Amino acid sequence: LRAIANDNLIVQVSLDGGRPEDHDAYRGPGTWEKTVEGIKILQESGFRVRLGTTETPANSAHLEKLCEFHRSIGILDEDHFIRPLAKRGYSKEGIELGMGNLVPEITVNLDGIFWHPLSTDADMQVSKNFLPLAPAVERVKTQLEAMYQTGGVPLMTFT
C-alpha cells in the first residue's frame, strides 16, 4: 500500500459510529474494531482517509460521539460525510433514492462506476469499466444536461 499512497489518492471508509454498538448494529458484530484497525493501517501507510457515515436509527443520537472519535484519530471534519440511510440493496428502511434526488458523486468500485455512493445498484451504474474514467464523467454530464432541459429524469441506460 505504501507504494501508491500520495496526496492525490484518498481512501474512503464506512464508519457508522464512534463506538462498536453504533457501527455494528448495521454493519455486523465485530466490524467496528476491524474498520478502525483498517483506518489506522491506511493512515500509517501514508493515505488520507475520508469517512462516510450512514445515519441510522441506531447511531443518530450518537453522531457527535463519532465526530469526537474521528478527530481523536486524526481525521478532519472536512473528511467526514454523513448521509441518510438509503432504501437500496438489502435495506428495508430509509429514503428512496434515484437520479432525481441525488447530486452526482461519481463512485468507483470493483463493479464499475456509479452515480453516487448511496446507489451502487445496477440501475445507477454509469459504466461497468472503471477505467478510463473520462467517458463515464461525460455520460454523467450528458444525463445532468438532459435533466436540466426536461425538468425531470429521462430514461437512460448507462452500461
Place the predicted regions along the sequence by residue:
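Short low-complexity, flexible loop/linker segments enriched in glycine and/or proline
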Residues: 1-3, 65-67, 94-95
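Radical SAM/AdoMet-radical enzyme domain recognition
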Residues: 1-55
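Active-site beta-loop-alpha junctions enriched in small/polar residues
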Residues: 14-18, 54-56, 83-88, 120
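Short catalytic/ligand-binding loop motif for oxyanion handling, primarily in non-cytosolic enzymes
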Residues: 20-22, 58-61, 115
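Hydrophobic, Leu/Ile/Phe/Ala-enriched alpha-helical segments that form helix-helix packing faces
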Residues: 39, 70-74, 115
